[in-house]
Every structure is written in structure tokens, then in C-alpha cells.
Amino acid sequence: MDRSKVANAFAALDAYARRSGAPKIADLFAADPQRFDRFHARFDDLLYDFSKHRLDAETLRLLLDLGRAAEVEPRREALFEGDPVNITERRAALHMALRNLSGAPMRAAGEDVAAMVEAEREKLLAFAEAVRSGAIRAANGARFTDIVNFGIGGSDLGPAMAARALSPFIADHLRLHFVANVDGADFADTMRNTPVETTLFIVCSKTFTTLETMTNAATARAYVAERLGPDAIASHFCAVSTQLDRIAAFGVRSDRVFGFWDWVGGRYSIWSSIGLSLAIGVGRDNFEAFLRGGEDIDRHFREAPLERNIPVLMALIGVLNRNVFGYATQAVIPYDQRLARFPAYLQQLDMESNGKSVDLSGARVAYETSPVVWGEPGTNGQHAFFQLLHQGTEIVPVDFLVAAKPTAADETHHRILFANCLAQSQALMQGRPLEAVSAQLAAQGLSPDAIAALAPHKVFDGDRPSSTFLYTALTPRTLGRLIALYEHKIFVQGVIWDINSFDQWGVELGKELAQKLAPIVGDDSASTEALDASTAGLVQAARARRAGA
């Protein structure tokens, strides 16, 4: 790639978007009654409205020029062709193959992986159906009632998010639980009201060495052995890993082990055997519908022209907000309570992928990369942080997600929810100027002095950008589509920023230091002389508190 072309394209975009006298978003709507028609994109029943951003037709043209200069299209093909796009680990990033229900050839390192992916998926779904039906039972002969998933990062965030999102589709006789934190309270709280005699534990760790996961799994194994006897372990555990020797030593039967491949990154692994807990919960048909939703977007992303390509448009607008306007964070606000964990899922997906400071050549980048991604469901967020969104000194772009139809039966609740979603995006864009506030206060009978004192506090500047994703209802297929949209958006941004979106070396140093600290923390007589003063002081303070000082 010729980075000078990217630099030139960005310079043209930056000069135009930040030109003197650039109109506000509300003025763009006033000048163009057809603005919504021009600045939204559709895929099937999914609508992406990006009209409430600070861009016009020329801005969009320049953004598309930037994408082409960065060679988004050939890089996209390299991704789908299984090229080693994860250059630091010399691997493909072929999670799309996991949702390739068509069986079309997909290659990693020159090997067509479609058949082996299908075989592993079929093994997983057959097991899931057997657990659901009661063909596979607990040691006492009873049907399983509870599924506990041990994992962390992508092995937890994905399944936990999806299980919450698709809760109406989970079998009535099953409850799904997710234990991630090495804090023993996580496991203890989960098991407090969970009957161990009808609980199936799933240990998700590719290497079967992940500290947090294996600590929790070992605790669970001892818990089962103590309450049900050691012979029950084989009936109550299964594993998602590639390390058969370690799994056998742990006590998991070989026919209850499910694998995946090194070209599947953790944050993309929900589509793989890591989704076993979800598959047990929702069943074969719904799990396949979830995969089909991701496959739908893969096809759209690969085939749609850039100007109508939703992940590409999402990425370009994100680059505009991050690199031209300097917005440091991105809020994700689903007006859909069952998507409560979606912001946290996207937080890992985005920040672990693109939270990088060196380019593909190893040189320091001279521009910002991933924003801080955060969010909570609406309307809850309106009573927490929306004050900052509307009147704070930082402008925070927002992604709103909302269904046209409720998954619950009560239409009244959904009408209120939907109205609030639209109202918030409208308020962020339009604002309320001082003149309008003053007129409103005057109509309420306030004196001129009272108006002068109060009005500045009630001004909304507006001109705060947002996108809205509208879909018919939150179904398994819809969820698959939403996840894949963000996956590909993040990939495109990584291409433009010339970074590796598929490694995560930033998680390693803390883990290494924790391994060195663990013996010191566990032995009150261990020396702290080699530690920095702060860490040593904290260790000594903890020792004193444990001793009752």
C-alpha cells in the first residue's frame, strides 16, 4: 500500500470537513429535506441511519476516496481468502468460515477448512441437542437444568452477551450461567442457587492453561467431587480446547471435547465451539440462524459497493469522528434490554482489535486509533450519563440500536422505549439554543432576571452526532448480523489505520507480572525488595490487614 496516497486522501478530507463555516447537522437537515434518504443504508430489514453525523455528500465522497486509497477492497479479499492478515502471529483471521453454512470453499494456509468446520459444528450441535433432550444426563440420571460456562475474554463475553440477548429462545428447563473472574466470589455466587447435581460445566480454554478459567474449573471439579463423588466429574464436565492431553488429565471424556483453530481469535470465537453454552440453550435451529446472520453480513460486506456497504460506512464515519473531529470515545446504547451486554462485548471487540500504537511495519503511528467504547442500555443510561452526552464538554458519538417490534408482548412498554430512543438522537442533533430556552421560561412566567440566571444552565448545544440501527426484532439471525457488522467495521478501520486488528500483545505484560507476583503475594515471608515502592507498599499493607493489624 502507498501510504502517501492515504495521507493525501486524509488531508483532503480533513481540510474539507473542518472548513470554516461548515454547517451544523441540524442545518444540513434544514437545507436538504431528503437527507435521510441520502444518508442511510439498508440490508434486508436492517436499517443503518447515519444522517445525524457531520457530513454531506462531498464528505462522504472524500471518505470513500480514503477507503480506496487504503486499499480496503483488496485487503478485504485477502481476509476472505485466508491470507495471514494477522502478521505478528502469521495467521489467517478466518472466523467467517465458522458461519459458512453454504459450505463454499474457504482456505486457511492454503487448506480448504469448510469440511472440518462443518464436522466440528455438527458434533457440537448433536451434543447440544442431546443435552437439551435429556439423552445426555447428569450422574444421577436426571436431566441437566443448569449450564455453567468457564471462560474469560472472548470465551465469556461472547456467549454471555448472546445468551442474554437471546434469552426468549432458551429452553424453559435450562438456565445458563457464566463465570469469568478469578475472584472466587464469581463462582461462589453462581453456585449459591444452582443445583450441582444437575449442572453441566463447560471449560473454555484453547490452551487449557488460561489462569482464570483453569482456576475456576479446578474449583468446580473439587466442588463436584466433594458433593457428588469423584466418579461424577466425567458426567458433569465438557471442554472446548485443543489440548487433549491436558483435558484428559483434568477428567473430561474425549467425546465431550470440542475444538477450534488458531485462525479463530478469542474475540471472534462465539461462532465456534466456544458457543456451546449458547447452542445448548437455544438449540440447533436458533444457533444456525445466528450463524446465518453473520454469514448474511459476510456476503454483504464482500459484495456490496463501498458506498452502500454498511460495515464500510460505519468504519469511515468512525474514522471521521476519531481522526478529523477528535472524538475520543464511542457510546453504544441499545434500546433493547436484552442487548445489555452488547456494549461490553463491543468494547473488547473494538479496543482489543484496534487499540494499537504501531503500524504493520512496527513504526509508531502519528494518529489516533481505537476510541474508548462504552455504553449501557437505554432508557437506563438517560438517568445516568446522558447529562454528559447532552451538555458535557466532550462530544461523544452514539450508536443507538432499537427494534421496531418488541420481543415481549407488551406494546405499551415498547412504544415508550422506541420514542425515547428517537427523542435522544433528535435532541443530541438539534439541541435547544438560548433563545428557545429563554422563550420557554418566559412562557412559564419567570422574570427577566430569573430567566437570565437560569437559561444558560438549560441550553443544549446540539450538533452531537449519532447513528441508529433499526431492525424488526431481536432474533438469533438479527444478533448474528449485528455482531458481524461491527466485526467488519473494525477490520476496515484497522486497514485505514494500517494496524494489525487481530493480535493482542497488550494483554501479555500484566499476565507475566502477575505470575511473578503470585508467589510473593501468597507468602508473607517473601521479600518485596525487587518490587517498585508502590507495589511493595501495597503488598505489605495487604499482609498487615490479613494479619489483623
From Swiss-Prot:
Enzyme class: isomerase
Keyword Kinase annotated: no
One annotated Gene Ontology cellular component of this protein: cytosol
Chief localization: cytoplasm
Keyword Isomerase tagged: yes
Family designation: Belongs to the GPI family.
Reported function: Catalyzes the reversible isomerization of glucose-6-phosphate to fructose-6-phosphate.
Protein name: Glucose-6-phosphate isomerase
Gene name per UniProt: pgi
